[in-house]
Design a protein with these regions (language model features):
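Acidic, glycine-enriched active-site microenvironments
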Residues: 140-141, 146
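Conserved aromatic-histidine-acidic binding/catalytic patches
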Residues: 142, 258-261
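A cross-taxonomic marker for long C-terminal extensions/tails that follow the last structured domain
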Residues: 136-138
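Active-site pocket-lining/capping segments in soluble small-molecule metabolic enzymes
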Residues: 2-124, 128, 149-151, 155-253, ...
């Protein structure tokens, strides 16, 4: 399958103006970020405020970059006024789309004419779910747990069934291409809530899975021999060395995890994926080339 660089969107994470500038100058096509308490990194990463939205949009538009606002936590009744205020401001300031998982947020965004992208928190894992949410969204983040053949089957199904979003275009598949992975299905983890009373599903993950642990048999007290002590911490995702297969499965938006990361990290990762995409377009992408990008 042949690819044009312009067909693929690199979406970069930003938690500061430094990261925003780094993403833009590294070649990102879009950026995503959060404001306030209604996003999945509200307490574990830097966040902007509603008053920052106009400036963010202005900077991004100057460089032809789209802006996506994450409003993707679990919402309770007491959160709905803040959700509406956030989305009203996003609409007024010209945010390109909001990334949402709660149905209340999805419905409100659509009611005010704000474009919706379906968040990974909805764990979309099959074609029927994609077909259902197509009435609300043109872009959907599929579950990270899917295999490449499973993603390809959904992509083929979208085309065969002509599944289109509100703008009349075929639904586009977005997937995480790089960054940290959660030990729980699509981030639905309860460790922080159980241990610290802080819900990861409300943006307050305490990263307990990133700590080192000893594993002991409670019956005899023997410690189990494991490769490392980070028994609950998955290896970070990196698709640059099988990017051709990833795109061949139908992924058109490459999402980079890392709103808590530095501007230098954002710049380097975006540059790597931009370089890989240009190599794919030029026909110079090889395993050796990809391995060099990972170094």
């Amino acid at each position: 399958m042949e690819f044009k660089r312009s067909d693929i969107e690199i979406m970069a994470p930003v938690g500061s103006y430094e990261s925003l500038q780094a993403a833009i100058h590294a070649g990102a096509d879009s950026v995503y970020f959060g404001v306030g308490q209604l996003n999945m990194r509200s307490r574990s990463a830097a966040n902007f405020t509603l008053d920052d939205l106009a400036r963010i949009v202005a900077i991004a538009r100057e460089h032809g970059v789209k802006t996506y606002l994450a409003v993707n936590t679990l919402l309770y009744d007491e959160d709905l006024p803040a959700m509406r205020q956030t989305m009203d401001r996003a609409k007024a300031e010209g945010i390109s789309a909001v990334i949402v998982s709660d149905q209340a947020g999805i419905l409100y965004a659509r009611s005010i004419g704000l474009e919706v992208h379906i968040s990974t928190q909805l764990n979309l894992s099959n074609l029927e779910s994609v077909a259902f949410y197509a009435q609300f969204a043109d872009v959907m983040v599929l579950a990270r747990e899917l295999s490449i053949p499973q993603v390809r089957a959904i992509y083929d199904g979208i085309r065969e069934r002509d599944i289109r979003g509100p703008h009349g275009e075929l639904v586009r598949i977005e997937m995480f291409a790089h960054g940290a992975l959660c030990m729980a299905i699509s981030g639905k983890c309860y460790l922080s809530l159980h241990e610290n009373g802080c819900s990861a599903n409300r943006g307050a993950c305490r990263q307990l899975c990133r700590r080192s642990y000893e594993v002991r048999d409670r019956d005899n007290g023997n410690e189990l021999v494991i490769q490392n002590h980070y028994i609950m911490s998955p290896k970070d995702l990196c698709t640059v060395d099988f990017l051709d297969k990833f795109l061949g499965a139908g992924v058109r938006v490459l999402k980079i995890e890392g709103r808590a990361r530095s501007a230098e990290y954002v710049k380097r990762v975006v540059e790597c994926y931009d370089e890989a995409l240009r190599a794919l377009e030029a026909g110079t992408y090889t395993p050796e080339f990809a391995a060099g990008l990972k170094e």
